[in-house]
C-alpha cells in the first residue's frame, strides 16, 4: 500500500523526477507508525491536490530551480543559532554561482535568514529576530512533536528542530514555500525529522 501512495503522489503531479526532489517517503513511513497513523491514508491525496501543477503556474520554474541545485556533500549544518548549512570552503566559486542562480529561481524568499555554504539567502523578513523574542516564552521543545501552521518556508521549523524537537511538521497554503523548504532539505537529507506539507 505504501508504494502505491508514493507513486500516486508522483503520477498526479505528472513529474517522476519529483521523488528525488521532494521526498515524503521518510515522513509517510514515520506517519504510518505514529499516533497520527489515521492521516496516512488521507494525507497523500491532500498533498497531491495542493501540489497539483495546474494550480501553480510558476511550478515548472520552481521545479527547474530545485533540479538545478548542485549536488554538494554537506559536512556541517546547524539550526540552533540560525539556519546554516555547509561552509564556504566546501564549494568552488563555480558551484557557488550555480547554487546562487538556482536559489534565485525560488525568489523572493520571505522568511529567513538562511545561509548555504557561506552564501546568504536574501529574505524579506528577519525571522531570526522573531525567534529570539518568542523563544524565552516557549516551553522546552526537546523531544516534542510540533505542528507549525502557517510555517511559510520553514525557517522556524528548522529552528525548532535545532532546539531539540523530535519531529516538526509545517503546513502552509503556498506551494512555493514547499519548494524553498526542500531547497534547504536537499542538503541536510530526507531522513531529517522535518517536513512541510
Residue spans of the language-model regions?
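Conserved alpha-helix/loop element of class I SAM-dependent methyltransferases that forms part
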Residues: 125-142
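N-terminal accessory regions of S-adenosyl-L-methionine
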Residues: 14-127, 186-187
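Conserved SAM-binding loop of SAM-dependent methyltransferases across substrates and taxa
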Residues: 153-164
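Conserved SAM-binding loop
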Residues: 181-182
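S-adenosyl-L-methionine
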Residues: 185-197
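Conserved SAM/SAH-binding beta-strand->alpha-helix loop
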Residues: 174
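Short beta-strand element of Class I
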Residues: 166-171
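Conserved class I S-adenosyl-L-methionine
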Residues: 144-152
